[in-house]
């Protein structure tokens, strides 16, 4: 474990179209091989398709979807006396949002490989699924809650 100062968090600038830092974080999550303009195009196209389907603003749809997938509790491994316990702990807000963005990206990637549709279509459907509290990303969030509920007996072993 490092004993130096903690690394400073870099400030993320808001995206150009909506002026949202959350959306820029998602663009950085989706981006591959440094191709930010391609990632922006994919996300903006998916949000415009979602706008047409629902009739609300793209940013509000996205923020609600991320909010629905954001976990508030997770389990962490804790070794005590030769036994390893899964201890439920609260998730920091920054980590919770990062997990939600990663899960949406992961579910989109899995759907794209499975169905053969374009990334834009899969991302749009995954955002709408998260908005309506269903889909792959929401399922991952529910699994976190189930694990925490199953290991509630070990909550007194908190860090």
Swiss-Prot record:
Q: Which InterPro entries match?
A: Ribosomal_uS7, Ribosomal_uS7_bac/org-type, Ribosomal_uS7_CS, Ribosomal_uS7_dom, Ribosomal_uS7_dom_sf
Q: Which Pfam families does the annotation name?
A: Ribosomal_S7
Q: Where is the signal peptide?
A: none
Database matches in Gene3D superfamilies? Ribosomal protein S7 domain
Q: Which GO terms describe its biological process?
A: translation
- Alphabetized UniProt keyword annotations: Ribonucleoprotein, Ribosomal protein, RNA-binding, rRNA-binding, tRNA-binding
Q: Which GO terms describe its cellular component?
A: small ribosomal subunit
The entry lists its GO molecular-function terms as:
rRNA binding; structural constituent of ribosome; tRNA binding
Job description of the protein = One of the primary rRNA binding proteins, it binds directly to 16S rRNA where it nucleates assembly of the head domain of the 30S subunit. Is located at the subunit interface close to the decoding center, probably blocks exit of the E-site tRNA.
Subunit (UniProt): Part of the 30S ribosomal subunit. Contacts proteins S9 and S11.
Which family does the entry's similarity section mention? Belongs to the universal ribosomal protein uS7 family.
Which NCBIfam families did the record assign? rpsG_bact
Question: How is this protein named in the record?
Answer: Small ribosomal subunit protein uS7
Q: Which gene encodes it?
A: rpsG
């Amino acid at each position: 474990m490092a004993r130096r100062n903690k690394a400073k968090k870099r400030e993320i600038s808001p995206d150009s179209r909506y002026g949202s830092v959350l959306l820029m974080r998602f663009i950085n999550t989706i981006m591959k091989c440094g191709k930010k303009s391609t990632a922006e195009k994919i996300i903006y196209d998916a949000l415009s398709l979602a706008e047409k389907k629902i009739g609300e603003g793209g940013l509000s749809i996205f923020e609600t979807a991320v909010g629905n997938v954001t976990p508030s509790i997770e389990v962490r491994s804790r070794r005590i006396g030769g036994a390893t316990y899964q201890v439920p702990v609260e998730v920091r807000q920054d980590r919770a949002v990062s997990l939600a963005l990663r899960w949406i990206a992961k579910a989109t990637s899995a759907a794209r490989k499975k169905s053969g549709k374009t990334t834009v279509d899969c991302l749009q459907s995954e955002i709408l699924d998260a908005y309506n509290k269903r889909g792959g990303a929401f399922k991952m969030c529910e699994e976190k809650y189930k694990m925490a509920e199953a290991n509630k007996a070990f909550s007194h072993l908190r860090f």
